[in-house]
């Protein structure tokens, strides 16, 4: 009989151990755990994400009950206190670096975005995760609660998180946006919370395109008007120059597009520095920003990033980055296996079959059952008669 790894083992194999070890050497600060390796910690954290364990006790007990399977994963049982200490003391920067490495691997096999243009397309947004003020005082957000904010740049080629920064809930989105490095020719889509004319000017000068919604209090002067196809929902296509008190921060001409959604009848006004793509394409690009909202909703519903197994800042960041690595592993599993199933169904099936020895294709496309020989039925009839 041919040897077959468990699904969990197959997923972990997407992470080259030599790269894991190299990152481990680069982030070797903090307390040393002689009998609890970084790989062991990562394996336990990944198990909790993929199986939806509700607590530290639940996760450790469930994992330790699979001692035989742990051996084949290169891990071993661990005490709950040792695991908690490792999450608190081993720097989360290691898992951030591992997440970035995994994105680079996953983007190679991911499908391209749906648009005809070849520019890279990204959506930029942030999502708040509420925390208990008593348990997480370091993340104080308002008088009665704490929170952390996940700032994310979503790559529309495969809908992969390309950049993630985890901050306190008080940190404004635009502050993190300025730290993101994008390739020339990229298109980044964001909502009005990211309106910063100085940043828009920097993007323009670096050859990066942006698409956003114009603020209602924006002051500008129209310098050119272009005809539009109103049958496509377009209302206007103009070239403008900002003339308000902060207009000097972005002296470059911008493109202002009016659009009415034919389904919701809601009117939108978009602002961009791209004068090449059609006005309808710009409107469609902004509508695609909804994909990052879907991404946030998916990870909150299917991964463990709302209940934490540690209360320190380091433990919270570690758990979130491991959750994002789990998301990338699921995407990589899906794209390489080329199965036509959504991530929602994929993670549900994997949760039930994590330690089953089979391929992913066998779970969704099981081999046909062999037909029983008619002689067997005749023998059964003779036996009971």
Give the location of each predicted region.
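Single, function-defining residue in the core of a domain
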Residues: 1-58, 62, 66, 88-90, ...
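Blade-loop segments of beta-propeller domains
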Residues: 66, 70-72
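Major-groove recognition helix of helix-turn-helix-like DNA-binding domains
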Residues: 73-92
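Noncatalytic carbohydrate-binding groove/subsite architecture in carbohydrate-active enzymes
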Residues: 113
């Amino acid at each position: 009989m041919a040897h077959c790894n468990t699904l969990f083992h197959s997923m972990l194999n997407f992470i080259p151990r030599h790269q894991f070890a190299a990152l481990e050497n680069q982030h070797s600060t903090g307390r040393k755990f002689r009998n609890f390796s970084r790989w062991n910690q990562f394996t336990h954290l990944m198990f909790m994400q993929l199986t939806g364990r509700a607590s530290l006790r639940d996760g450790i007990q469930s994992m330790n009950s699979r001692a035989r399977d742990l051996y084949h994963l290169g891990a071993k049982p661990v005490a709950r206190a040792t695991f908690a200490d490792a999450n608190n003391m081993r720097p989360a920067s290691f898992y951030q670096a591992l997440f970035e490495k995994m994105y680079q691997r996953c983007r190679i096999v991911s499908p391209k975005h749906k648009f005809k243009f070849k520019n890279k397309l990204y959506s930029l947004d942030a999502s708040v995760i509420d925390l208990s003020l008593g348990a997480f005082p370091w993340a104080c957000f308002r008088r009665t609660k704490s929170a952390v904010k996940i700032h994310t740049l979503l790559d529309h080629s495969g809908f992969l998180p390309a950049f993630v920064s985890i901050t306190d809930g008080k940190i404004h989105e635009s502050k993190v946006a300025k730290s993101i490095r994008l390739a020339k020719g990229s298109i980044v889509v964001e909502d009005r919370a990211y309106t910063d004319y100085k940043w828009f000017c920097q993007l323009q000068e670096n050859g990066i395109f942006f698409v956003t919604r114009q603020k209602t209090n924006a002051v500008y002067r129209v310098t050119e008007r272009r005809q539009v196809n109103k049958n496509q929902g377009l209302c206007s296509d103009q070239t403008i120059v900002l003339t308000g008190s902060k207009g000097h921060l972005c002296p470059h001409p911008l493109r202002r597009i009016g659009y009415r959604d034919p389904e919701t009848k809601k009117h939108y006004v978009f602002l961009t520095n791209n004068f090449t793509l059609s006005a309808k394409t710009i409107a469609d690009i902004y509508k695609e920003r909804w994909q990052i909202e879907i991404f946030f909703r998916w990870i909150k519903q299917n991964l463990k990033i709302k209940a934490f197994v540690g209360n320190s800042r380091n433990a919270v960041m570690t758990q979130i980055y491991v959750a994002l690595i789990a998301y990338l592993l699921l995407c990589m599993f899906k794209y390489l296996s080329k199965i036509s199933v959504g991530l929602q169904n994929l993670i549900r099936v994997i949760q039930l079959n994590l330690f089953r020895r089979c391929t992913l294709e066998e779970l969704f496309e099981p081999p046909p059952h062999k037909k029983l020989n008619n002689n067997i039925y005749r023998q059964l009839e003779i036996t009971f008669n």
